[in-house]
């Protein structure tokens, strides 16, 4: 199957992006190098082409009431121009996807609008699942700016950098706040809408914005001219792992529940509403979980990768879900599921790396978090 290309594919190639397959897309894994890109985001500012992500719009009446039956989080706690992180669940409490819900309020057409940003690999199944659960409602499901480009700009200098280019005040936009702005006429001939949110996947201050390809290309080039470092999937992974942010397919999946994954704060059982997976989660909240996701630090130079066994008292008890060398902390870190009874900080364990046992310890998560 031919891989899909984002609207910024050529721009990435021209900057030396090393392209790899990812969730049916051809995406840059790196530009100047993972360490340099990672450090740019931690210390200055970097940007990512994340146009492969799914962006879905729900329009109609009583959308929140319908959506409340599909997620375990209280969606009524957010209002227009606000957003929240949550998950879609199966009846057994397993996680179908993690996502961000953006409340756009009421449109000029008197319709309510909710925008969902979902994972690229889960886009088709999520849309099918939404359609099957909302088909009796007066709600339409469509891609939001289907031809658009999505860019993330992340790092301590992201606010000042983006404010200069967009000529738009952004420091007053709260965390998980969002709004639609009009593009700076100096960037593109015609003024166009840009959907911008103060969100990210790095543990740093940052923004994500969606616009037409033409506007995105103009902003991308202006960011490069301003000295912003282009970053690939490799740095995005090390950054999110340091911040203990979950990667779907690795750290969460259909066989893991929010309580097991350390996402219990997303589950609002105090709500009277029923939602898919509620019964399973109520039972788990009552009796506890058999496994938990923990942070691990390998105590030598061994790097634990996805699928490596975790041992306790020489017995295999778990599996690594994500692992890397942390450029910020200068040590190997990983996430893994282990039995709940040993999921305690300072528990001594081992990780089997290429048939050799390496000493490790369970540590507090996140490994690092400065901004978001």
Curated annotation (Swiss-Prot):
Coiled coil: none
Any single biological process term in GO: glycine decarboxylation via glycine cleavage system
Key word Transferase present: yes
General function of this protein: The glycine cleavage system catalyzes the degradation of glycine.
Family the UniProt entry places it in: Belongs to the GcvT family.
HAMAP family: GcvT
Keywords, in A-Z order: Aminotransferase, Transferase
Any single Pfam family the record assigns to this protein: GCV_T_C
GO molecular function: aminomethyltransferase activity; transaminase activity
EC number in record: 2.1.2.10
PANTHER family on file: AMINOMETHYLTRANSFERASE, AMINOMETHYLTRANSFERASE, MITOCHONDRIAL
InterPro entries: GCS_T, GCS_T_bac, GCST_C, GCV_T_N, GcvT/YgfZ/DmdA, GcvT/YgfZ_C, TrmE/GcvT_dom1
Reactions performed catalytically: N(6)-[(R)-S(8)-aminomethyldihydrolipoyl]-L-lysyl-[protein] + (6S)-5,6,7,8-tetrahydrofolate = N(6)-[(R)-dihydrolipoyl]-L-lysyl-[protein] + (6R)-5,10-methylene-5,6,7,8-tetrahydrofolate + NH4(+)
Domain of life the protein comes from: Bacteria
Subunit-level organization: The glycine cleavage system is composed of four proteins: P, T, L and H.
Top EC class for this record: transferase
GO cellular component: a single term: glycine cleavage complex
Protein name: Aminomethyltransferase
């Amino acid at each position: 199957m031919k891989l899909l290309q984002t609207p910024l594919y050529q721009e990435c190639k021209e900057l030396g992006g090393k392209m790899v397959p990812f969730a049916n897309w051809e995406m840059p894994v790196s530009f100047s190098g993972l360490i340099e890109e990672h450090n740019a985001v931690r210390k200055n500012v970097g940007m990512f082409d994340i146009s492969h992500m799914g962006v879905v719009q729900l329009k109609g009446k009583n959308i929140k009431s319908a959506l409340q039956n599909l997620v375990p989080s209280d969606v009524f706690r957010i209002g227009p121009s606000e957003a929240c992180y949550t998950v879609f669940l199966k009846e057994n409490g397993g996680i179908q996807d993690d996502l961000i819900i953006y409340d756009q309020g009421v449109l000029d057409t008197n319709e309510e609008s909710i925008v969902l940003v979902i994972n690229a690999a889960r886009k088709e199944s999520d849309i099918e699942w939404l359609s099957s659960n909302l088909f009796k409602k007066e709600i339409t499901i469509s891609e939001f700016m289907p031809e658009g480009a999505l860019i993330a700009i992340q790092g301590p200098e992201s606010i000042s950098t983006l404010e200069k280019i967009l000529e738009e005040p952004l420091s007053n936009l709260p965390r998980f706040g969002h709004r639609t702005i009009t593009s700076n006429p100096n960037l593109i001939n015609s003024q166009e809408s840009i959907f911008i949110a103060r969100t990210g996947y790095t543990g740093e201050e940052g923004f994500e914005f969606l616009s037409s390809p033409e506007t995105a290309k103009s902003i991308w080039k202006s960011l490069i001219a301003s000295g912003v470092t282009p970053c690939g999937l490799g740095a995005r992974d090390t950054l999110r792992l340091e911040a203990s942010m979950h990667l779907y397919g690795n750290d969460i999946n259909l066989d893991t529940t929010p309580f097991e994954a350390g996402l219990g704060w997303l589950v609002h059982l105090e709500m009277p509403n029923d939602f898919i997976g509620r019964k399973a989660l109520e039972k788990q909240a009552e009796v506890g979980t058999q496994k938990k996701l923990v942070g691990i630090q390998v105590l030598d130079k061994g790097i634990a990768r996805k699928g490596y066994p975790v041992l306790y008292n020489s017995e295999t008890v778990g599996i690594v879900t994500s692992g890397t060398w942390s450029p910020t902390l200068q040590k190997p870190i990983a996430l893994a599921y282990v039995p709940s009874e040993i999921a305690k900080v300072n528990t001594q364990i081992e990780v089997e790396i290429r048939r050799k046992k390496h000493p490790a310890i369970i540590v507090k998560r996140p490994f690092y978090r400065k901004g978001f």
